[in-house]
C-alpha cells in the first residue's frame, strides 16, 4: 500500500515542532524512500538541518538536482554554515559558469523567501570582503521585509549608516502584504461553501490510520507549507485549514465545541480574552472595556461550515459572514502549534455596559491561508465529511469540555455596523443559510477593513519600536555611546529591561571607560537573564579592569558550565586567569575561544594583549592581524598593533595604527591620548598638546590623559602648568605613586628640594615593595631634560606591563591603569 504523503508530512512537522528530531528524521527517511519528490527531499533535508546535522543536509541536497527555491536556499544555508562560501554564492546568484543573477532575478525566483535569500547572500559578500555588494543585498532585503533585524545589524557593523526611519517602514500596501506569510490573512468564513460536502475515496478508516486522526494539526506551522503532489491528494482542497481544526476528521470535529467565557479586562486586538502578559501593544490603543456582566457568547455547532480565508485584496464574497461567539484571540505574533484551542475567527462582544467592538486576530501565524493560496500539506486529509468520521465521533467528542449553557444577550448593532441575532440557551446552529444573512444584515467589508487596519497598526507599532532600537544600535556602532545610552534608556520599560537592550547599554558604558556603570548594568543582565551568553565577554573585561577577581571567577565558572561551545565563556575564563597573572593558562583559554569560533575577533584581540604581557610581540602581532582580518572595524586590534609598534619605537607606524583605530572610534579619549604621546615622541609637542586637550574635552576626568599632558608639559619645561595638572590629577587618583613621583620631579626642577623629597617619599610609601619600578624608570626619557639619567625602554609609561604588574589594589588606583592598559 502506497504511503499517503500528506498525513506523513503532518506527522513529521508535528515531530519537528515538538523537537522530536529522531522521530522526524526517521519518518522523513521513510517518506523519501516512498516518494522521491523534491518536496520529500526538502523535508528530509530540513529534518537533518534542524537536528544539527548540516553536513548531512548538504550532502543529501548536493547529491540531487535542486530545482525548487526551498531546496536551493537550504543548500546555500548549509554551505555557509560549513564555510563553503563560494559554493553558497553560486547557488544563490550564479557563478562563473552561470549568468550572474540580479536582485530582481532573485526576487522573482525565490518569491516570499527572497528577503532571507538576499540577507544570506549579503552575509557571503561581507565575509569575502565585498562590502559594497553585501550592503546592497542587505538594503534590498530590508526593503522587501522591514521586519528583519539582522540585515540592519550587519549594515551597522560593517560601517554603513542606514537610516532607521527609512528602513523600518512600509513603502506601500503591497510591501506590507509581502512582509507577512499567507497564513496571516484574517479569516472570514465563506457561506457559499457551507453546503459543500467534500468527497473522499476513503470509504473505511483502517485501524492503523485512526491514530493519524488524533494529530493536533495546530502544531503544523503554516510557514512550512509545501506544494503537495496532486496525484497523492485524495481529498478536495477547498476545505478547512488544519490550523482551525484541533482534532479528528470531517466537519463533525467542531460539533459541541465549547468556548470559555472571556475574562473581563482590556481588549487590545481580539476580544476581551486577548489581553495577557504576552499580548504586545506596539502602540495600539486598547478598546473599550466590557462590562462585568458580559455573557459567555457560547455556541454549539453540530455541522460547522468549512472555514476559508478572505483574500487580502479584491472584493469579498457577498455571502461571507462573520462567525458569532468565538473566544478571544491569541496574542499578536504568537507561535502556533502549542494550543488545542480552536482558532477564533471574528469575535463580537456585546454587553449592556460600554459597547466594545472586538476585532479579529491580527498577524497570528495560526490563521489559515487565503483560498487563492495553496492549501496546507495536511489540510485535505483530515476534513472529510464521509462515514469515516462516524467511527471516531464519540472519541472525539470526549476531548471537549461539557456544554455550558449560554446567557441571553440582546441583539445590538455595534460600531462596525454588524448586527448579530439573538442567542438562546439551547440554540444549536446547524447551518448558516441565506435567511440568516438577510435577516441579520451581516456585513463582510467592515470586519475585513477593520482587521486589516489593526494588522497595519500593530505592524506600524512594531516598526516604531524597531526605529528607536535601530537608532540606538546605529549610534553604538558609530561609537556615539552617550547618544546610544540616551536613546535606549527611553525605550518602554518592558523592552528596556531585557538582556539585549541592557547589554548594548553596558557596552556603551564600557566604551566610555565607565566601568562601574557598565558593571552595574551587566550584573542586572545576569539577574534577569542568567542564561544569556552574548555580551558576557565585555562584562568579563569590565570586571578585569575593576580587578573584581571573585565576581570574574564566578562569571567564568557559570558560563563554561552552561556552554562550553561558546567563545564568550572561554574569553571570560581567560580574563579570570589573566587577572591572577596566570598568563600561560589565560593564553590557553583564549586559544580555546578561537578554536570554538575561528571568526570571533575579540578572542584574537584578548590573546594578542596576553602575548604582549609575556613579551611575545611577534605572536601578538599575528593575533591582532587575524582580528583585523576577521573584522576590519575592530578598532581594539588596530590599537594593539599601534601599542606594539610604540614599544618597538616605530613611532610613525604606531601613529598610523592609532589613527586608524581613531577613525573607527573617534570618540575614544584613550586613543587620542596615545596618539598625543606618539606625536610627542616624534617631536611634535604642540600637536601632541592639542591632541591631549581634545582627549580631555571628551573625557575631563580621564586620569591617563591628564597624566600624559602633565608629562608633556614637564618635558617642555612648563613646570607650573605641569604642577597644576598633577595637583588636579592627585584629586582623581590620590593613591597613584607615579603622580607623586612626577610631582617630586617638578619640585626638583623648581628648586624646592624639600617638597621634592616629600613627594618622592610618598611615592615610595605607596609602593614599598618596588613593584612599580617606574618610580625610577617609567617616566620616558623623552619627557626628561638631557641631564636626567636614561631609563630602559621596557618600562615606558605606555606599556601594558605596568597595568598588570602594578601593586595598586584600590579602586581609585585602578582607574589610571585600567584605562592605560587597553580598551580591549
From Swiss-Prot:
GO molecular function: protein phosphatase binding
Keywords from the named record: Cytoplasm, Cytoskeleton, Nucleus, Phosphoprotein, Repeat, TPR repeat, Ubl conjugation pathway
Organism of origin: Homo sapiens (Human)
Record bears the keyword Nuclease: no
Family statement: Belongs to the APC3/CDC27 family.
Gene that specifies this protein: CDC27
Domain of life: Eukaryota
Subcellular compartments: Nucleus; Cytoplasm, Cytoskeleton, Spindle
Protein name: Cell division cycle protein 27 homolog
